[in-house]
C-alpha cells in the first residue's frame, strides 16, 4: 500500500528517500538530493525538518550538509515547539549543537523557547547532559531563563538530581535563591544533606520563607525532625527567631509536632536559649559582606589559611 502510494506521490517518495539516507548516514545521497533542488526546510506531519531529524538521530555530517545548503535551525516543530537544538540537547548531541551555534542563527536559537517556555538549557539540565550545559553556557546562553511555570534550568537539575549540571550552573552564577529560596528548601524537604551543604557553602540565604506560608528552611527542618539539616542551617546563619505566617518560630513548630524529647527539638531548644558567640557572628557577617558571587574567591583573600578554612566552615562537625 505504502509502495503504491509512494509511486503516486513523488514528493512523499523523495521525503522517505532522504530520511532513509539520513538514518543510514548516507551523506552522498543527502548531498546529491540537495544539489538537485530538494529543500532542507520541508516539514513532515509533526513539523520536523531534516535538521530536527538528523539532530535527534545524531547524524553530525548530515547536519553539516543541511546547514551548508540553507537549513533553518530556528524552525520549531508542531509537537512542543522545539527546535533542532532542543532535540540535540535532549539527546546530548554537543558536537551537532556546536555546528548550529557557530552558524549565523546562534542568537535566534540559543535561548529559543518551546511551547512550555523551555530553552535548550532547560532541556539539557532536565536530562543531565552536563557537556551540553557547558557548551550552551560557553556560547553565552541565558543561565536563569524562566519557563512558563517560572522554572529555571537549575531547578530542573535539582529536582532531577543531576548533580553535575547543578554544579556547572552554580559555577556560572545561576541564582541560588531563585523563587525566594526554593533550592535550599527543596533540599531540606528531601533530606538531601549533600545538596543542603553545597547550597549553604555557596551562600544560599538561610532565612528566605515560602511565599504561601512563610516557612523557612529551619522551620521545615523542624517539621521533618531533621537535626543534621537544622545544625547546618544554624551554623550558616539561620535565625531561630524567624516566624512563619502563623507566628511560629522553628522551635514552636518542633514543639507542635510533639512536646517529647527529640534530637531536633533538643537542638532548637539549646540554640534558642543561648546567643551565638562573637566569632560565629563575625563569620556570618563576613560571608554576607563578601557576597554570593565572591564566596568562591575566599582563597584569594590575604588572610591566614586557618581563617579561610573557618570561613568555609571546614571545622564544622556536620
From Swiss-Prot:
Summary of subunit composition and partner proteins: Interacts with CUL5. Interacts with RNF7. Interacts with PSRC1.
Family the UniProt entry places it in: Belongs to the ankyrin SOCS box (ASB) family.
Alphabetical list of InterPro entries matching this protein: Ankyrin_rpt (IPR002110), Ankyrin_rpt-contain_sf (IPR036770), ASB7_SOCS (IPR037326), SOCS_box (IPR001496), SOCS_box-like_dom_sf (IPR036036)
Protein name: Ankyrin repeat and SOCS box protein 7
Keywords from the named record: ANK repeat, Repeat, Ubl conjugation pathway
Pathway membership, UniProt: Protein modification; protein ubiquitination
Domain comment, as recorded: The SOCS box domain mediates the interaction with the Elongin BC complex, an adapter module in different E3 ubiquitin-protein ligase complexes.
Amino acid at each position: 500500500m505504502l509502495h503504491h502510494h509512494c509511486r503516486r506521490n513523488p514528493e512523499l517518495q523523495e521525503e522517505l528517500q532522504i530520511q532513509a539516507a539520513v538514518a543510514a548516514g548516507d551523506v552522498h545521497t543527502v548531498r546529491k538530493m540537495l544539489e538537485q533542488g530538494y529543500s532542507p526546510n520541508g516539514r513532515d506531519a509533526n513539523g520536523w525538518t531534516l535538521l530536527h531529524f538528523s539532530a535527534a538521530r545524531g547524524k553530525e555530517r548530515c547536519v553539516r550538509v543541511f546547514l551548508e545548503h540553507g537549513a533553518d535551525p530556528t524552525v520549531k516543530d508542531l509537537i512542543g515547539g522545539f527546535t533542532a537544538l532542543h532535540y540535540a540537547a535532549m539527546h546530548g548531541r554537543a558536537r551537532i549543537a556546536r555546528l548550529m551555534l557557530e552558524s549565523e542563527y546562534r542568537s535566534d536559537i540559543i535561548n529559543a523557547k518551546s511551547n512550555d517556555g523551555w530553552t535548550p538549557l532547560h532541556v539539557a539540565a532536565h536530562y543531565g547532559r552536563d557537556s551540553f550545559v557547558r557548551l550552551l553556557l560557553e556560547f553565552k546562553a541565558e543561565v536563569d531563563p524562566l519557563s512558563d511555570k517560572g522554572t529555571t534550568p537549575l531547578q530542573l537539575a535539582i529536582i532531577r538530581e543531576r548533580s553535575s549540571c547543578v554544579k556547572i550552573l552554580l559555577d556560572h552564577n545561576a541564582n541560588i535563591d531563585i523563587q525566594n529560596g526554593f533550592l535550599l528548601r527543596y533540599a531540606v524537604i528531601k533530606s538531601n544533606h549533600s545538596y543542603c551543604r553545597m547550597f549553604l557553602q555557596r551562600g544560599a540565604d538561610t532565612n528566605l520563607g515560602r511565599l504561601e506560608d512563610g516557612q523557612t528552611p529551619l522551620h521545615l527542618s523542624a517539621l521533618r525532625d531533621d537535626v543534621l539539616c537544622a545544625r547546618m542551617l544554624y551554623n550558616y546563619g539561620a535565625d531561630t527567631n524567624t516566624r512563619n505566617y502563623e507566628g511560629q518560630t522553628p522551635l514552636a513548630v518542633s514543639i507542635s509536632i510533639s512536646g517529647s524529647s527529640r534530637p531536633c527539638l533538643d537542638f532548637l531548644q539549646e540554640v534558642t536559649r543561648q546567643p551565638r558567640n562573637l566569632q560565629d557572628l563575625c563569620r556570618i557577617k563576613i560571608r554576607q559582606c563578601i557576597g554570593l558571587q565572591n564566596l568562591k574567591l575566599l582563597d584569594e583573600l590575604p588572610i591566614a589559611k586557618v581563617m579561610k578554612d573557618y570561613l568555609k566552615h571546614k571545622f564544622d562537625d556536620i
